[in-house]
Amino acid sequence: MKPWKLLDSEDLVDAPWLKVAKEKCELPNGKVIDDFYTLWQPDWVMILARTKDNRWAMTKQYRHGTQAIMLEFPAGIINKGETPEKAAIRELQEECGFCPPGFIPGSVDADEYRCRNEVRHDNFNADGDRIHNDTCVDPIAATTSCSRMTETEKTSITYLGSFSVNPDRHRGRFHVVFIDDVERLGNTHFDDTEDIETVTLSDEEFQAKIADGTFNHPLQIAGYFKWKLTQK
């Protein structure tokens, strides 16, 4: 089996958060498709944040795509230069006010925490595979940074991998980060378009929400079960 050959590409939408292209492709059998449309959005991360009493930190907010209030795990765009873990820490505090254990909002020692706790800068190849880099770089921004407290907290942040958003025509990926024993220590920092309510659910309550259709975000369900498989 061979990949398609890209013959031409025309940008139809070139916005900061969305790109749409019309591509001309040649299939292995020689057939040419003149108008295959692809989408690109920045990679984003979902955060499976579990409190000390084993409850999931979650959000409720209006989503215009579904025109409904949606129950979700915290999530957000990975900014340029950020690792998925770094983006997860930032988004978790911004949306919910929660921090990983031992983190102090506003601390200037974030780089020390991140290096000593082995949350490192990684890259990804074209197939989405993680390329590990042992060098710690890019300190977490001061507004969401925190300092290292104990050696026992070093395993609280776990990168679980990434998925294609839609293998058919979407070029972006979403990443999954699990953070255990989170604490509500900081203030939230919403964008001017956000109105977010924080809720917590036990694992049993959350699974019931999946079963009854209250929680129906397919990508986040995939991320949750990615974590669930690591518990066996």
Which residue ranges define each predicted feature?
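Conserved hydrophobic/aromatic beta-strand scaffold that supports enzyme active sites
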Residues: 20-24, 48, 58, 176-178, ...
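Acidic, metal-coordinating catalytic segment for phosphate/diphosphate chemistry
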Residues: 8-46, 52
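Conserved Nudix-box catalytic region and its N-terminal flanking loop in Nudix hydrolases
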Residues: 2-3, 39-41, 46-90, 94
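Nudix hydrolase/Nudix homology domain
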Residues: 1-4, 69, 80, 159, ...
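The catalytic Nudix box helix
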Residues: 58, 73-103, 143-159, 177, ...
